[in-house]
Amino acid sequence: MRKRLSALAPLLIIAFTLTACGGGSSVAEESFIEGSGAVTNIKLEDRKAAPALSGMTLTGKTFIFNPGKVAVVNVWASWCSPCRAEIPTLIELSKQYPNVQFMGILTRDNPVNAEALARRLNIQYPTFIDDALLLGFKSTLPANAIPSTVLIDKSGNVAARISGEVTLTSL
């Protein structure tokens, strides 16, 4: 019996070590789920005002969004694989539609890591580093699904939401 246990000990140690190598490396990462990519359009009569969007951006500048044009607000984090995957699509769309204001909201992330990713991928639209901005979307966005994207109409109302990775066809 002792020989069996001593023979199994290395296997148990390896198994324990491998289970400790889970997907996320922080509590912030593990508390989020990936959205399904579902698009929800909100009827005109059911639309509610989007929260005021202003604050410090990754570049250290203050940005204030003034309603009057359509806006796309993307919630992301640098550690989120689907977020990183959708960034080139958002960049391409922001270039195709210069009259649409694209913005990002960084959530539960280290701004230094996010700023490095934004610089590497050449994200030109502003990204807010204030998680408190998300509170204004609490009735619109799932609290723990990223990436998430909100479309704001010209009147400043939430017109649609995408829970999950944005694609060229979903936006």
Regions found by a protein language model. Name each.
Residues 45-71, 138:
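A short beta-strand-turn-helix
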Residues 75-77, 105-108, 130-131, 165:
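Active-site-proximal beta-strand/loop segments in catalytic clefts of secreted hydrolases
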Residues 1-52:
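N-terminal targeting signals for export/organelle localization
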Residues 84-122, 133-138:
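Structural microenvironment flanking redox-active thiols in thiol-disulfide oxidoreductases
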Residues 62-84, 90:
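Short active-site neighborhood of thiol/selenol oxidoreductases, capturing the structured segment around
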Residues 119-124, 130-171:
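Thiol/disulfide oxidoreductase modules built on the thioredoxin-like
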